[in-house]
Amino acid sequence: KDKVEGTDVMSFKFSKQNDQLENKITLLDYTAGQFAFFDIGEVYNDPKGPLRHFTISSSPTENFIMFSTRIRDSPYKKRLSILEKGAKVKVRGPEGEFVLHQDYSKPAVFLSGGIGVTPFRSMIKYATDMQLPVKIIMFDSNRNRNNILFKKIQVKI
């Protein structure tokens, strides 16, 4: 659990590598915009169990894996919100084809609302870090200014 984004959204960061292994292998190779399944272990009174999918909001250029979610009153989200630093989480994936296009002569136009901005955070951070020659145009709708997520990333484009 890293920080609160907006009003009811939390971002969770996890180590990208298993430092206990001799080769320090990367545990998840993904493309900006993809999602993965996160298993947080025992969740009581939740018929859906301990596995949920989340868009990876971090960029592959960052040294951590991050996902962001609205914290609601479900058993899963309650358990997620009290995870201790260093907690083990199983990850399966990545999956999905909602990624930045490769034709940089055409602008990338993003439309998002609220928590739907998460794949764009990943793509914008990646494009910025890699200095890709792509023009990014973003339209992001929120209830008010306090609910804008990832303000620093959005200001850069």
Regions inferred by a protein language model and the residue ranges of each:
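Ferredoxin-reductase
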Residues: 1-87, 142-144
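FNR/FR-type flavoprotein reductase catalytic core
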Residues: 72-157
